[in-house]
Design a protein with these regions (language model features):
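N-terminal beta-alpha supersecondary unit
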Residues: 1-27
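Stable alpha-helical structural segments in soluble proteins, enriched in small hydrophobic residues
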Residues: 4-8, 43, 61-64, 140-153
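DPxDG-like acidic metal-binding loop motif
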Residues: 19-48
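Surface "functional belts" at beta-alpha junctions
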Residues: 47-139, 154-158, 164, 169, ...
């Protein structure tokens, strides 16, 4: 965090707000990022805004979609377990707008539209990948850009809470087995 602030030439107390990716994504990564953002928000007395990771990727992809006349598209990322996290967007006023989702499903259940993101690169037999976007993933820059744009336009953002689309892989251990005497 300090390195990023140093590179930007600012201090934490100079910030007006923080933006954090809320997922969908891996449980541990989401919890770590959200806990860090919440702690920094408290320490610096600034609000913390949530941004869906798929929205961050859609924001980046939207420029390409607009340039190529793609009115509706899907963003998909790796959800592991042979599934993708995905959402369906449309260009509205030159900006991607969420129509449906986010979802988690096997790739062959995704809406048949051009697909931006690493999910398309993983499942080329099921998804119509947009060339040069088959490895794209959400970025911190994209999260910040979506938050800044929404706040400038007076739009709300999602709560800074994890967006889980399925149950955790972690299991609570059952009772201990006792050895027979």
């Amino acid at each position: 965090v300090q390195t990023v602030l140093d590179q930007a030439g600012v201090t934490g107390i100079a910030l007006d707000a923080l933006a954090v990716g809320v997922g969908p994504g891996p449980f541990t990564g989401l919890r770590a990022g959200l806990a860090t953002a919440a702690a920094l928000g408290l320490a610096w007395d600034v609000p913390v805004h949530g941004v869906r990771s798929l929205d961050a990727l859609a924001h980046a992809a939207g420029v390409d979609a607009f340039r190529h006349g793609i009115e509706e598209f899907v963003v998909a990322t790796d959800a592991r377990r042979r599934e993708v996290y995905w959402a369906h967007y449309a260009q509205v006023g030159g900006q991607p707008t969420l129509l449906h989702g986010p979802f988690v499903s096997p790739a062959d259940e995704v809406t048949p539209l051009p697909v931006y993101g690493a999910g398309a690169g993983l499942y080329p037999e099921a998804l119509r990948a947009v060339p040069d976007w088959e490895t794209a993933t959400p970025s911190a820059v994209g999260v910040g850009q979506v938050a800044e744009l929404a706040l400038r336009r007076g739009r709300g953002l999602v709560p800074a809470e994890p967006l889980y689309l399925r149950e955790s892989d972690a299991k609570v251990p059952g009772p201990r087995k006792r050895a027979g005497a």
